[in-house]
Regions:
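Local cysteine-cluster metal-coordination motifs and their immediate loop/turn environment
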Residues: 30-49, 74-97
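Glycine-rich dinucleotide-binding loop and its adjacent helix/turn
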Residues: 111-127, 185-205, 230-292, 399-410, ...
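Feature captures the FAD/FMN-dependent oxidoreductase FAD-binding
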Residues: 127, 132-136, 184-235, 333-342, ...
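N-terminal Rossmann-like FAD-binding beta1-loop-alpha1 element of flavoenzymes
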Residues: 131-157, 282-290
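Rossmann-like dinucleotide-binding cores of NAD(P)H-dependent redox enzymes
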Residues: 155-158, 162-192, 197, 286-333
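FAD-site-proximal beta/loop scaffold in flavoenzymes
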Residues: 239-270, 355-428
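A conserved FAD-binding loop/helix module that cradles the flavin
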Residues: 424-452
Length: 454
């Protein structure tokens, strides 16, 4: 995939990958063997008919390819950019046995971008079936559920807590990985289908789940409110100035443009930044810090590179952009001056012991190996949990001890007519898994309402 030069892109927020040309897309699509048993489809959480859309691309029929994709996915331009295809559809590609797998994700992105560039494309709005469904949260789970239900004729309203629709797609994923204009285009397409989007609506505070159903006539509610409550390490110094959760750091950077001189919510311009964690969010935070002008940015992770949960592509991009990896190290204290600003982070070196419950080798401290990392800002990226607000205001809604909503395989919660999916159920996971949950719940909601009204 053509990309910006690392030493150029680490100073701007423009998209890293520039995408396929028509000629390259057709050439790549022609590598597909069109296998009869279609293993790639089984590797896709939303079950896109991958060989079918690739066949259309190979023949130069990009409109036909989009029609195939859109039957299964409401967010193809998003998926083509941020889904971990290398561990899903592309990992099942027969081509990958002896050579590189077909670039399924890149082809999906190409098709979606081609479609979005057309000015004469009209969305066919289905006839209303007279039933109302509320969606709480406008992230990938909520938008997917909304799109599938709208296509079935439902009157769908999405309630978003922030001032812009998109959820984690706009506040969590940086512009250089997923341009906000792409997300807005996907949201606009849903609006053309008839989906209503209400922003600045915190469900659980402005309105409750019960009020949506009892007072506003929604026959079912889907909760896709994500997992935006950050976790911390509970070590000394986490309350110092210059310590951010990755959630706050990325939201300020991506959504509020806090790095601009005229920002009403400014963010600290640090010279040396430590990002604690090894997932995709940690990579995003580190790469943002570099673009914000930090001279040195460190990823501090307590395991080895082999155990990094981030996508390999994101790790490689971070390395190319000059991010320094301090592996097998764990913070024990954040240090500050008398004005309570960060001056450093004390770490201890680790070694890997026996595997833990996750199957990864457990990191063990090496006694006497403490050292101080010279930094003036720290970003904590060790995971998130669902916000407890909906749980606290919805009687009879069962949740896990850690806060996740309990739902069955179809997304049904302990409350009749109330469904949930995505990070609100699983904890922080991938965009495509959230989309799969939204899709499954949409089918279940449709069945529930249709059976209820027989």
């Amino acid at each position: 995939m053509p990309s910006q030069d690392p030493n150029v892109r680490n100073k701007n927020f423009l998209e890293v990958a520039t995408g396929y040309t028509e000629e390259v897309a057709i050439e790549e699509a022609q590598r597909c063997l069109n296998c009869k048993h279609r293993p790639c489809v089984n590797g896709c959480p939303v079950h896109i008919a991958i060989p079918d859309f690739i066949k259309e691309v190979a023949q130069g029929n990009f409109a036909g390819a989009y029609d195939v994709i859109s039957q299964s996915s409401s967010l193809p331009a998003v998926c083509g950019r941020v889904c971990p295809q290398e561990s899903q559809c592309e990992s099942k590609c027969v081509r990958g046995i002896k050579t590189e797998p077909v670039g399924i994700g890149r082809l999906e992105r190409f098709v979606a971008d081609w479609h979005n560039a057309q000015t004469d494309v009209k969305v066919n709005k289905p006839e209303s079936n007279g039933h109302k469904v509320a969606i709480v949260g406008s992230g990938p789970a909520g938008l997917t559920c909304a799109g599938d239900l709208a296509n079935k004729g439902y009157d769908v309203t999405v309630f978003e807590a922030l001032h812009l629709a998109g959820g984690v797609l706009v506040y969590g994923i940086p512009e250089f990985r997923l341009p906000k204009s792409i997300v807005q285009k996907e949201v606009d397409t849903l609006k053309e289908l008839g989906v209503k989007v209400e922003t600045n609506m915190v469900i659980g505070r402005v309105l409750s789940i019960d009020e949506l159903m009892d007072d506003y006539g929604f026959e079912s509610v889907f909760i896709g409110s994500g997992a935006g409550l950050p976790r911390f390490m509970n070590i000394p110094g986490e309350n110092l100035c210059g310590v951010y959760s990755a959630n706050e750091f990325l939201t300020r950077t991506n959504l509020m443009k806090a790095y601009k001189d005229d920002s009403t919510t400014p963010i600290m311009h640090a010279k040396k930044v430590a990002v604690v964690g090894g997932g995709n969010v940690a990579m995003d935070a580190a790469r943002c810090a570099k673009r914000l002008g930090a001279e040195e940015v460190y990823i501090v992770y307590r395991r080895s590179e082999e155990e990094l949960p981030a996508r390999k592509e994101e790790v490689e991009h971070a390395k190319e952009e000059g991010i320094i990896f301090k592996l097998l190290n764990n913070p024990v204290e954040i240090l500050g001056n008398e004005d309570e600003f960060v001056t450093g982070m004390k770490c201890i070196k680790m070694e890997l012991g026996e595997p833990d419950a996750s199957g990864r080798r457990r990191p063990v401290e090496i006694p006497g190996s403490e050292f101080v990392l010279d930094v003036d800002a720290v970003v904590i990226s060790i995971g998130t949990s669902p916000n407890p607000l909906i749980k606290a205001t919805t009687k009879g809604l069962d949740t896990q001890k850690w806060g996740g909503i309990i739902a069955d395989e179809n997304g049904l919660t302990s409350r009749e007519g109330v469904y949930a999916g995505g990070d609100a159920v699983t904890g922080a996971a991938t965009v495509i898994l959230a989309m799969g949950a939204g899709k499954t719940a949409a089918a279940a909601i449709d069945e529930y309402i249709q059976n209820k009204n027989k």
